[in-house]
């Protein structure tokens, strides 16, 4: 059972790193497409990527770490504000 828990936690960590790499590549190459949903209307300030995605990445990191703690049997923590 411990081997299954360790493998699950390892897969979560690997998945998290793959997600981060894909997100970074997406932001670097695709955020300036004309039809991109997060693009600001003409004449407005450009989007600060750190502001747009910071909260969602924090929540995702919390969810991944919480799932890992649950798999390993550690106690839970509160989500970041």
Curated annotation (Swiss-Prot):
The keyword Transit peptide does not apply. One of its GO terms (cellular component) is cytoplasm. Keywords: Developmental protein. Coiled coil: none annotated. It comes from the Eukaryota. Belongs to the neuronatin family. May participate in the maintenance of segment identity in the hindbrain and pituitary development, and maturation or maintenance of the overall structure of the nervous system. May function as a regulatory subunit of ion channels. This is Neuronatin. It comes from Homo sapiens. The gene is NNAT.
